[in-house]
Amino acid sequence: LERCKTAKEAVELITSLIQTYGQAGNCGFDKKFYYDNAFLIADETESYVLETAGRNYAIKKVMDTATISNCYSIRDDYNFASNNFNGDFKATYQNNLFTYVAGAERRKKTSFNILMENDSPFNLMAKALSSHSSDKITVNKSSTDSVCMHAGNMFGDQTTGSYFGEINSCYFVT
């Protein structure tokens, strides 16, 4: 993605790579676990949600606020879809049982609702990324319903680090 100058170029690169090479690779630590990817891609002027299913994908331009959380959100409101797809992308590709067990819709709703609150963008991002589904969640007790998941317990695939920043014309992450 470092070769892209805009969010639109990044979307075009990712979709080109997906169509050429597909998606593969076990993302489970000690078990076989595969899933398709979603991307929230932004530059200083525009943002996109890109959701994938194998070599298929749907792209939706973000008009205001968007969140992703391991569940499909693009229905028939996409700006572009691969292979002349016509229909409801989420209804076609989402595994409802996996999505429910993973708490994906609940996490997505939580992060979106927090971002809609009236506060500074940095405070809202920090609040969203550190939010738990219950006051009972601690470092020793995790939940797939929480945006912030602590490693350990019966779950071994949590993301324990988050990052956010203000997008300017010059932006570096190392």
Residue ranges and their predicted role:
Residues 11, 15, 26-30, 34-37, ...:
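C-terminus-biased signal that marks the final domain/tail of proteins
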Residues 46-59, 159:
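Structured soluble/peripheral alpha/beta segments that form catalytic or ligand/cofactor-binding pockets
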Residues 1-20:
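Well-ordered mid-protein domain cores that form the structural environment of catalytic cofactors
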Residues 42-44, 52-53, 62, 166-168:
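Structured loops at beta-to-helix junctions and adjacent beta-edge loops in soluble globular domains
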Residues 21-25:
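Phosphate-interacting basic helix/loop segments used at nucleotide- and nucleic-acid interfaces
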Residues 59-65:
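Active-site and NAD+-binding cores of ADP-ribose-processing enzymes
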